[in-house]
Amino acid sequence: MAFTAFLLLLSSIAAGFLLLLRRTRYRRMGLPPGSLGLPLIGETFQLIGAYKTENPEPFIDERVARYGSVFMTHLFGEPTIFSADPETNRFVLQNEGKLFECSYPASICNLLGKHSLLLMKGSLHKRMHSLTMSFANSSIIKDHLMLDIDRLVRFNLDSWSSRVLLMEEAKKITFELTVKQLMSFDPGEWSESLRKEYLLVIEGFFSLPLPLFSTTYRKAIQARRKVAEALTVVVMKRREEEEEGAERKKDMLAALLAADDGFSDEEIVDFLVALLVAGYETTSTIMTLAVKFLTETPLALAQLKEEHEKIRAMKSDSYSLEWSDYKSMPFTQCVVNETLRVANIIGGVFRRAMTDVEIKGYKIPKGWKVFSSFRAVHLDPNHFKDARTFNPWRWQSNSVTTGPSNVFTPFGGGPRLCPGYELARVALSVFLHRLVTGFSWVPAEQDKLVFFPTTRTQKRYPIFVKRRDFAT
């Protein structure tokens, strides 16, 4: 018994000594202060545990209070520099491809495919990013997509019964919109079948990338294979149609097929897979949380209704929204901004240092990961007054923030700025217009937000809806 106790004491002393040596070595290297946590595991479990709750902030708050806004930690198997500092985040984003490169978990890389926009680098990424933006800019939305967005929103809302799972309905809308934009398909059995496979793919993003040990990942890989097979059929059929002289459609697939140096079917499929994820998951979550936050803030909901009822009063019974209507929704844009700030659908981005990098007096070693946390900045009271309160009126002020001008980054920044940011704003604005002018609603159950593996409500936000008398 005494010998066992002695061994435990000796082991504790040895572990403490090794920890002290490690801290001393890192201090001499000029690394930011922090803790690497337990061997191999690091602080991953603490992070996941916090983000599976409605209030994950303590994980960041405690470390910022102790170490400062840039600190060292160990996440998902790798030493990581965590930045809750807007200037550091901007530096990381702007130096994409120079000092830093994108770096994501193996599960995400495998499920998206090696030719996805997220994983492209250098000149190819620049070219494909520009191509993607050309199909989602203001001019394209105004001239081509606005009517499609409005039509698809109305099509889905017309099918609503008394009780709906809002997050599921929002996912249908955004998926159908993305499929239409990319491949010119209207809603139907094919798109709904594809969407259900996508649900499984997304569930596997933050799973252990070992099919033998992770059922979630295994199902995700199988679903990804089915998605790729379905998209390959579409690509091959479109190639045949164009070779036979069919009129070229004005969508992303047509642009990819017409590219000067040509893309293989596999490259096009990977590209489409990633764009479907990007346009589907994030925008649908923003829609759901905008409604949740508005429901919990009656004054904001009342002002939003007033703005949209003025637009509706100028229309005929059966009307379509136009670009000019979107541009006359100032308070709606305040709601959109505040939803993006509070919800933080994209909580941050991982990058990897391509060389030794010095910033703010600290050294980031080559090969180390950096996590630029948008969430930490957006919810920092040093940058936004009452930062953790949903307050869309703050965006009516000419001086929204109390800190530097680069603190609001819901769509990232630098060369990897989200190419669909304007399309997401328009889709949410149109959805809110049709919802508040066509329905009243109340929550069917209490529902909570969680933030891992993605931002979502636990129960998919069930609501009871009632059609308003003048709805068309």
Curated annotation (Swiss-Prot):
InterPro entries: Cyt_P450, Cyt_P450_CS, Cyt_P450_E_grp-I, Cyt_P450_sf. Heme binds at residue 418. GO terms for cellular component: membrane. Keywords: Heme, Iron, Membrane, Metal-binding, Monooxygenase, Oxidoreductase, Transmembrane, Transmembrane helix. Pathway: Plant hormone biosynthesis; brassinosteroid biosynthesis. Disruption phenotype: Dwarf plants containing severely reduced levels of castasterone (CS) and brassinolide (BL) and of their precursor molecules. The keyword Glycoprotein does not apply. Its cofactor is heme. It is a single-pass membrane protein. GO terms for biological process: anther wall tapetum cell differentiation; brassinosteroid biosynthetic process; brassinosteroid homeostasis; pollen exine formation; positive regulation of flower development; response to UV-B. GO terms for molecular function: heme binding; iron ion binding; monooxygenase activity; oxidoreductase activity, acting on paired donors, with incorporation or reduction of molecular oxygen. It is found in: Membrane. It is an enzyme of class 1 (oxidoreductase). It catalyses: (22S)-22-hydroxycampesterol + reduced [NADPH--hemoprotein reductase] + O2 = (22S)-22-hydroxycampest-4-en-3-one + oxidized [NADPH--hemoprotein reductase] + 2 H2O + H(+); 6-deoxoteasterone + reduced [NADPH--hemoprotein reductase] + O2 = 3-dehydro-6-deoxoteasterone + oxidized [NADPH--hemoprotein reductase] + 2 H2O + H(+); 6-deoxycathasterone + reduced [NADPH--hemoprotein reductase] + O2 = (22S,24R)-22-hydroxy-5alpha-ergostan-3-one + oxidized [NADPH--hemoprotein reductase] + 2 H2O + H(+); (22R,23R)-22,23-dihydroxycampesterol + reduced [NADPH--hemoprotein reductase] + O2 = (22R,23R)-22,23-dihydroxycampest-4-en-3-one + oxidized [NADPH--hemoprotein reductase] + 2 H2O + H(+). The chain crosses the membrane at residues 1-21. Its EC number is 1.14.19.79. Belongs to the cytochrome P450 family. Catalyzes C3-oxidation steps in brassinosteroids biosynthesis. Converts (22S)-22-hydroxycampesterol (22-OHCR) to (22S,24R)-22-hydroxyergost-4-en-3-one (22-hydroxy-campesta-4-en-3-one, 22-OH-4-en-3-one), 6-deoxocathasterone (6-deoxoCT) to (22S,24R)-22-hydroxy-5alpha-ergostan-3-one (22-hydroxy-campesta-3-one, 22-OH-3-one), (22R,23R)-22,23-dihydroxycampesterol (22,23-diOHCR) to (22R,23R)-22,23-dihydroxy-campest-4-en-3-one (22,23-diOH-4-en-3-one), and 6-deoxoteasterone (6-deoxoTE) to 3-dehydro-6-deoxoteasterone (6-deoxo3DT, 6-deoxo-3-DHT). This is 3beta,22alpha-dihydroxysteroid 3-dehydrogenase. It comes from Arabidopsis thaliana (Mouse-ear cress). The gene is CYP90A1.
